[in-house]
UniProtKB/Swiss-Prot annotation:
This is Putative membrane-bound redox modulator Alx. Residues 1-6, 65-89, 135, 220-225, 283-286 are periplasmic. The keyword Cell inner membrane applies. It comes from Salmonella typhimurium (strain LT2 / SGSC1412 / ATCC 700720). It is found in: Cell inner membrane.
Length: 322
């Protein structure tokens, strides 16, 4: 697999991730189960975005010094584009988590604990998926067309789908887990397992954690091929992807109280998926430059947020008039 990643770059990335996760887990252990405040969520979100941009700047500087700007510029731009794509698509994942926590009545103080382990699991699973996907593409280049068609289909499906938490309990995964795990009827504080009468029982909190991991895998099937449309370099795909999801937990608590204010966002994400799908399908006829792709994705998100703000304004105006 061709990659710009050197041992120094891989090592630097690993050190940053391990240090930040260690700090996060240490704070979680000291404070115990508690809900992240809006102020804390905003602070952590800003920190993760800043850290991602600083990493990209260091990445660009290293490549510029070792291989020249003709290599550094497009690679740093590819990281930024991949990061923006993953960050925007991750918002839809946040809304699914909201439905899961609401359906299973998980208190805010326990949601953070679930998401800590959820993000750790996502790091492992996505790393495996990215390396497997990169290897498959290098062996079977025609898979890019399959990914493109899949993203096109997914984009249309996302625009037409209706979000409803009432059907979560009937999903095959939930029914299978409930049928095969000895499980308590209620959440037992912050425990995933408890002992009763000498027997080990899973709690509904474990079920929620498994569903959080499962939902992330489903969304990764969309987002990882989307980044492959920008670059197939495993270093850039992995680092941009993981930096985006490392800030996902903070993003969840930032958006959890205002999710209903982003009703138009899924349509913007759908358009992004359709654009990326088309980009992959026409690659043999016309190669869309990375800078153009970044501009299109950023433009779609900006237009979507403007429309969303207008819709919210009209809705609020109607409510005030009643």
């Amino acid at each position: 697999m061709n990659t710009v990643g050197t041992p120094l770059l891989w090592g630097g990335f690993a050190v940053v991730v391990v240090i930040m996760l260690s700090i996060d887990l240490l704070l979680q252990g000291r404070r115990g189960a508690h809900a992240m405040s809006m102020k804390q969520a905003a602070g952590w979100s800003i920190l993760w975005v800043t850290l991602s941009l600083l990493f990209n700047a260091a990445f660009w500087w290293y490549l510029a010094e070792t291989q020249g700007r003709e290599v550094a510029d497009p690679q740093a731009l590819a990281f930024l584009t991949g990061y923006l794509i993953e960050k925007s698509l991750a918002v839809d994942n946040v809304f699914v988590w909201l439905m899961l926590f609401s359906y299973f009545s998980v208190p805010p103080a326990l949601q953070r604990r679930v998401l800590v382990y959820g993000v750790l699991g996502a790091i492992v699973l996505r790393t495996i998926m990215i390396f497997a996907g990169t290897w498959l593409i290098t062996q079977f280049e025609w898979l890019l067309y399959v990914f493109g068609a899949f993203l096109l289909f997914t984009g249309v499906k996302m625009a037409l789908a209706k979000e409803d938490e009432s059907g979560i309990g009937e999903k095959p995964m939930v029914r299978w887990l409930r049928g095969h795990l000895r499980m308590t009827d209620t959440i037992e504080n912050e425990h995933f397992f408890v002992r009763k009468n000498g027997l080990l029982y899973a709690t509904p909190l474990l079920l929620v954690l498994i569903m959080v991991e499962f939902s992330d895998v489903i969304f990764a099937v969309d987002s990882i091929p989307a980044i492959f449309a920008v670059t197939t370099d495993p270093f850039i795909v992995l680092t941009s992807n993981l930096f985006a999801i490392l800030g996902l937990r903070a993003m969840y608590f930032l958006l959890s109280g205002v999710a209903e204010r982003f009703s138009m966002l899924k349509y913007g994400l759908a358009v992004i998926l359709v654009f990326i799908g088309i980009k992959m399908l026409i690659v043999d006829f016309y190669h869309i430059p990375i800078a153009i792709s970044l501009g299109v994705v950023f433009g779609i998100l900006t237009i979507t947020l403007v429309i969303n703000a207008w819709v919210n304004h009209q809705r609020d105006k109607k409510l005030r008039a009643q």
